[in-house]
C-alpha cells in the first residue's frame, strides 16, 4: 500500500510542479517581459477580481495553484492507469483519453460546462463561483477527492498484481 500510494503521489506531485511551473513561466513571460498584465488585463477568470482589487500577487498565486491542482489530477490519473495497465504509453495517453471520453459521455447531461462538476474543471479550466476562495476551495476539494479515489482503487489492484507476480 505504501509503495502504491507513494507512486501515485509522485505522479501527482510531478503533475503539480510541471503545470504550476509552466503556469509561472507563462505568466512571467506574458506579464513581466511582454507587459500584458495590469489591473484590468491578464487572466480572464474569477481570479481577475483579485487583480482588479490590487491584490495582483495573491491573484496570480491562486491562479497558478489552481492550474497546478489540475496538473496533480492529470499526473495522478496517468500514474493510476499505469497501475491498471502495464504499459507506460497508456499512462501518457490516459488523461487526455479519459477527459475526452467523459466529455463525450456527459454531453447530454444537464451539467453546466463552467461548473465544478464538468470534467474540464477537473483537468484544465477554471470553473465559475461566487468568490475566488469558493472556486479555489472547490478545486482543491475536487482534486483531493479524485486523487483519494484513485489511491483507494489503485492500492488493491497493485496488491493483487504483486501477489500474482
Would you name each region that the model predicts?
Residues 144-165:
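Junction motif at the cytosolic side of a transmembrane helix
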Residues 82-117:
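Transmembrane helix segments
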Residues 11, 96-100, 147-148:
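Residue-level recognition of pore/gate-forming positions within transmembrane alpha-helices
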Residues 27-39, 87, 107-115, 158-164:
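Transmembrane helix-loop junctions in multipass membrane proteins, especially transporters and channels
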Amino acid at each position: 500500500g505504501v509503495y502504491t500510494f507513494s507512486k501515485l503521489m509522485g505522479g501527482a506531485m510531478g503533475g503539480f510542479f510541471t503545470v504550476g511551473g509552466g503556469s509561472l513561466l507563462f505568466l512571467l513571460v506574458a506579464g513581466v517581459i511582454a507587459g500584458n498584465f495590469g489591473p484590468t488585463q491578464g487572466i480572464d477568470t474569477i481570479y481577475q477580481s483579485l487583480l482588479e482589487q490590487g491584490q495582483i500577487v495573491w491573484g496570480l498565486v491562486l491562479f497558478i495553484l489552481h492550474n497546478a491542482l489540475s496538473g496533480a489530477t492529470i499526473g495522478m490519473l496517468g500514474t493510476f492507469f499505469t497501475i491498471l495497465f502495464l504499459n507506460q504509453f497508456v499512462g501518457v495517453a490516459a488523461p487526455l483519453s479519459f477527459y475526452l471520453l467523459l466529455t463525450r459521455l456527459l454531453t447530454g447531461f444537464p451539467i453546466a460546462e463552467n461548473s465544478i462538476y464538468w470534467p474540464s474543471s477537473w483537468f484544465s479550466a477554471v470553473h465559475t463561483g461566487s468568490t475566488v476562495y469558493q472556486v479555489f476551495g472547490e478545486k482543491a476539494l475536487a482534486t483531493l477527492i479524485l486523487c483519494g479515489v484513485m489511491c483507494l482503487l489503485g492500492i488493491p489492484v497493485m496488491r493483487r498484481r504483486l501477489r500474482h507476480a
